[in-house]
């Protein structure tokens, strides 16, 4: 995603996939004002830990299903069933809340709100993808928004940054779009870049990304 992940007024550009394979995931995303609110809360951590590998704010997202590296030919068959799924699912009311870490290496913010519906959506997304014959790693769905990763030997920074988010409670917002996203993870030493392959309005079917 070279443009920001916005569920309401995002300006994602659908780009052709030029490689033989692409790394793919399905996600929701908070709107700009919710991201700005969290970014302000992260101000002290940004200042104290500049060496952490901070994700770009415009790329913040909530992963529903990580499909891994797929042949580009496996992507088009996903579009029709995901269109149908999005059309029958209602938007979700969510909020960003608190913070934590995975193994003192990955910093994240938590998700609250319509969690039962969020888990249901993630389960249905994964089932639809598998019905298309796409096999991907089975991971327990733990709703979160990844913010940063620690440098080797600097795990204390992640723990400290997570503690700084303990009291954060963001405003509620509506997750109204489902995103099919490609990334360049593992394709060189540069920063991770994302692009939207397609996006669908929940409850209203598909429209151009």
Q: Where on the chain are the PLM-derived regions?
A:
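Histidine-dependent nucleotide/RNA phosphoesterase domain, centered on the 2H-phosphoesterase fold
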Residues: 2-209
């Amino acid at each position: 995603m070279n443009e920001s992940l916005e569920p309401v007024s995002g300006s994602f550009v659908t780009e052709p996939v030029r490689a033989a394979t692409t790394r793919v995931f399905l996600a929701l995303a908070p709107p700009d004002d919710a991201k700005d609110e969290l970014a302000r809360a992260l101000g002290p951590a940004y200042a104290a830990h500049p060496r952490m590998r901070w994700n770009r704010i415009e790329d913040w997202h909530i992963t529903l299903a990580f499909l891994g590296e797929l042949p580009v030919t496996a992507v088009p068959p996903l579009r029709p069933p995901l269109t149908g799924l999005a059309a029958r699912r209602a938007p979700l009311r969510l909020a960003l809340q608190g913070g934590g870490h995975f193994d003192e290496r990955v910093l994240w913010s938590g998700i609250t709100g319509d969690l039962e519906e969020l888990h249901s959506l993630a389960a249905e997304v994964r089932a639809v993808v598998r019905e298309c014959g796409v096999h991907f790693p089975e991971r327990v769905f733990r709703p979160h928004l990844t913010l940063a990763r620690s440098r080797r030997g600097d795990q204390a920074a992640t723990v400290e940054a997570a503690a700084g988010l303990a009291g954060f409670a963001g405003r509620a917002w509506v997750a109204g779009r489902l995103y099919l996203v490609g990334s360049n993870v593992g394709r060189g030493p540069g920063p991770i870049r994302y692009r939207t392959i397609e996006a669908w309005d929940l409850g209203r079917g598909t429209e151009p990304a």
